[in-house]
């Protein structure tokens, strides 16, 4: 193990130490609606810079050449002296995500993160969305990055130490499959839960599958709403769905929080309501009292879900990095409102079935200690893997939080996600035309994505309706390491080497230190090598069965089972 760790370190050291930066000047690229400038601004490289991206679709594209396929760090040298701007990055003609350019007064480097480039020539472009900025150069390293480790630093437990067993099991399930599988997901009709209407019907007809992750929206459940579904109400719908599938499904929820100010009608769009988030997070105001009553109402619904052991991936205050919702584009007040929601729901109402998903701005105000999972909403013009967006969010949290596509228009190409290490925990396509119209998804595309070997659908899920469950690793302290040292050091040689002891005894590697296994995506030492059981199927390219498995086939090698849609050796 020591030699293996040293080898990995040396590889990373070589890449990071000797990679050189190569500049590709914007003024030498292909220009569409932008102009080359050579004065006004100073501090640029080359012979000039380009701007101003005045109209949607204006772009600059450069051709770069790399020695091998891989992930390459990209830096854009820019000036945004007309205010903060958001514009779109393309790589080889595909959308790679939106880039936020912070306001400045001179040319500065913006590290965009890693992008996937093929061996040989590739194109990198910037396309106007908000426009009105200047670009000097695109800069990449001349050697690819080492592969990103997406699992080893994940928080081992939920942030709520009182989480119910069903929520613990769901989180462990998501964590265990993160970096290996991508779960399918779909949004149904507004105000519905477990809705098997036209969206689900289209998927099932085209693919023969049901999504792993379903969605509900408390859009009509605030006190100001004058209409909401009845008989059944939204909670009854969710419970009926939970019972129908015997707990073998995952439900997510957002809350388009309709609310009225002192004048005007209720709404969730900022332009349609006079309600103030700044006042709402100030105790003693009528706005504060109003949000507490709304939270209490929704909490009453979620309590009914908890009563039947139903966990919920909870996504309130979604898309708060934008300015279209009344809670958006106000980082300090939004973070404060998030904490009010958490304290009221968890500590006051005792809602311990929630997995808290943050879908918004990443900055110094982000309430990191109140977040389990990170969600990103992307409505791209193509089926690109959105690797840049994935890396930006994953890196901000230091690899401690899973990142999912909490909303998408087009499903990202699954194989490209795998190739580019964009391990979205799940995708969740919006309803209506985004899943119904061929302009977004053809039947062939849906079948390709839902039946891809990496994608997990509802038929592969276990039941999460459990009354007892302990985390597979860690404890209820997200600041601790992922090590699960259940065996004492006198029994396990790996403890002094910085690795936990294995709970099981399946050998996947042996060196001078002893026998090693892998549990929870981490090396672990097998304490009593005399009792070790060799995973014979590893040598044949197949894992050993993790749980007890029915025998599907027997040959000269041994008995075979099936887990997660793949053969596994029974030991």
From Swiss-Prot:
<feature type="binding site">
    <location>
        <position position="324"/>
    </location>
    <ligand>
        <name>substrate</name>
    </ligand>
</feature>
<dbReference type="Pfam" id="PF02156">
    <property type="entry name" value="Glyco_hydro_26"/>
</dbReference>
<dbReference type="GO" id="GO:0016985">
    <property type="term" value="F:mannan endo-1,4-beta-mannosidase activity"/>
</dbReference>
<dbReference type="GO" id="GO:0030246">
    <property type="term" value="F:carbohydrate binding"/>
</dbReference>
<dbReference type="InterPro" id="IPR022790">
    <property type="entry name" value="GH26_dom"/>
</dbReference>
<feature type="domain" description="CBM6">
    <location>
        <begin position="22"/>
        <end position="141"/>
    </location>
</feature>
<dbReference type="InterPro" id="IPR009034">
    <property type="entry name" value="Dockerin_dom_fun_sf"/>
</dbReference>
<dbReference type="InterPro" id="IPR017853">
    <property type="entry name" value="Glycoside_hydrolase_SF"/>
</dbReference>
<protein>
    <recommendedName>
        <fullName>Mannan endo-1,4-beta-mannosidase B</fullName>
        <ecNumber>3.2.1.78</ecNumber>
    </recommendedName>
</protein>
<feature type="binding site">
    <location>
        <position position="286"/>
    </location>
    <ligand>
        <name>substrate</name>
    </ligand>
</feature>
<feature type="domain" description="CBM10 2">
    <location>
        <begin position="534"/>
        <end position="571"/>
    </location>
</feature>
<dbReference type="InterPro" id="IPR002883">
    <property type="entry name" value="CBM10/Dockerin_dom"/>
</dbReference>
<feature type="active site" description="Nucleophile">
    <location>
        <position position="407"/>
    </location>
</feature>
<keyword id="KW-0326">Glycosidase</keyword>
<dbReference type="Pfam" id="PF16990">
    <property type="entry name" value="CBM_35"/>
</dbReference>
<feature type="signal peptide">
    <location>
        <begin position="1"/>
        <end position="19"/>
    </location>
</feature>
<keyword id="KW-0677">Repeat</keyword>
<feature type="domain" description="GH26">
    <location>
        <begin position="165"/>
        <end position="459"/>
    </location>
</feature>
<dbReference type="Pfam" id="PF02013">
    <property type="entry name" value="CBM_10"/>
</dbReference>
<dbReference type="InterPro" id="IPR008979">
    <property type="entry name" value="Galactose-bd-like_sf"/>
</dbReference>
<comment type="similarity">
    <text>Belongs to the glycosyl hydrolase 26 family.</text>
</comment>
<dbReference type="InterPro" id="IPR005084">
    <property type="entry name" value="CBM6"/>
</dbReference>
<feature type="active site" description="Proton donor">
    <location>
        <position position="319"/>
    </location>
</feature>
<feature type="binding site">
    <location>
        <position position="379"/>
    </location>
    <ligand>
        <name>substrate</name>
    </ligand>
</feature>
<keyword id="KW-0378">Hydrolase</keyword>
<dbReference type="GO" id="GO:0006080">
    <property type="term" value="P:substituted mannan metabolic process"/>
</dbReference>
<dbReference type="InterPro" id="IPR000805">
    <property type="entry name" value="Glyco_hydro_26"/>
</dbReference>
<feature type="domain" description="CBM10 1">
    <location>
        <begin position="491"/>
        <end position="527"/>
    </location>
</feature>
<keyword id="KW-0732">Signal</keyword>
């Amino acid at each position: 193990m020591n030699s293996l760790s040293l080898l990995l370190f040396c590889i990373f050291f070589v890449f990071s130490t000797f990679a050189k930066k190569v500049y590709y000047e914007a003024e030498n690229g292909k220009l569409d609606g932008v102009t080359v400038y050579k004065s006004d601004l100073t501090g640029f490289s080359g012979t000039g810079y380009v701007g101003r991206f005045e109209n949607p679709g204006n772009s600059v594209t450069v051709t770069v050449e790399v020695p091998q396929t891989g992930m390459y760090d990209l830096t854009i040298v820019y000036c945004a002296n007309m205010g903060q701007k958001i514009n779109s990055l393309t790589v080889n003609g595909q959308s790679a995500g939106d880039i936020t350019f912070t306001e400045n007064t001179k040319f500065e480097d913006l590290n965009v993160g890693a992008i996937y480039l093929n061996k040989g020539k590739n194109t990198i472009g910037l396309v106007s969305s908000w426009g009105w900025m200047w670009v000097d150069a695109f800069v990449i390293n001349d050697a690819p990055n080492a592969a990103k480790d997406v699992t080893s630093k994940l928080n081992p437990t939920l942030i709520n130490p009182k989480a119910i067993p069903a929520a613990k099991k769901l989180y462990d399930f998501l964590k265990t499959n993160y970096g290996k599988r991508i779960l399918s997901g779909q949004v149904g009709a507004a105000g519905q839960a477990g809705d098997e209407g036209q969206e689900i019907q289209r998927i099932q007809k085209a693919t023969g599958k049901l999504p792993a992750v379903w969605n509900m929206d408390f859009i009509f459940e605030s006190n100001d709403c004058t209409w909401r579904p009845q008989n059944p109400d939204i909670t009854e719908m969710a419970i009926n769905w939970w019972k129908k599938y015997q707990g073998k499904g995952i439900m997510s929820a957002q809350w388009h929080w309709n609310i009225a100010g002192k004048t005007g009608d209720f709404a969730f769009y900022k332009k349609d309501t006079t309600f103030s988030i700044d006042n709402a997070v100030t105790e003693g105001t009528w706005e504060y009292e109003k949000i507490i009553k709304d939270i209490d109402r929704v909490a009453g619904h979620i309590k009914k879900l908890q009563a039947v052991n139903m966990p919920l991936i909870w996504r309130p205050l979604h898309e708060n990095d934008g300015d279209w919702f009344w809670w958006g584009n106000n980082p300090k007040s939004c973070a404060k409102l998030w904490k009010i929601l958490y304290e009221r729901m968890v500590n006051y109402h005792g809602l311990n079935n929630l997995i808290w998903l943050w879908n918004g701005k990443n900055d110094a105000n982000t309430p990191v200690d109140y977040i389990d999972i990170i969600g990103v909403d992307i409505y791209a013009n193509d089926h690109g893997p959105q690797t840049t967006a994935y890396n930006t969010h994953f890196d901000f949290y230091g690899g401690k939080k899973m990142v999912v596509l909490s909303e998408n228009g087009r499903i990202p190409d699954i194989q490209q996600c795998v190739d580019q290490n964009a391990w979205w925990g799940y995708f969740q396509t919006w309803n209506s035309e985004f899943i119904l119209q061929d302009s977004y998804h053809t039947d062939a595309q849906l079948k390709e994505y839902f039946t891809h070997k990496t994608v997990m659908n509802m038929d592969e899920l276990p039941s999460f309706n459990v009354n007892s469950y302990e985390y597979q690793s860690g404890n209820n302290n997200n600041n601790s390491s992922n090590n699960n040292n259940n065996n004492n050091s006198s029994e396990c040689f790996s403890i002094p080497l910085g690795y936990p002891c294995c709970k099981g005894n399946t050998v996947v590697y042996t060196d001078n230190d002893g026998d090693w296994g892998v549990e929870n995506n981490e090396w672990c030492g097998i304490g009593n090598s005399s009792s070790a059981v060799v995973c014979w199927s590893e040598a044949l390219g197949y894992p050993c069965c993790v749980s007890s498995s029915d025998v599907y086939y027997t040959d000269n090698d041994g008995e075979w089972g099936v887990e997660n849609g793949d053969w596994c050796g029974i030991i």
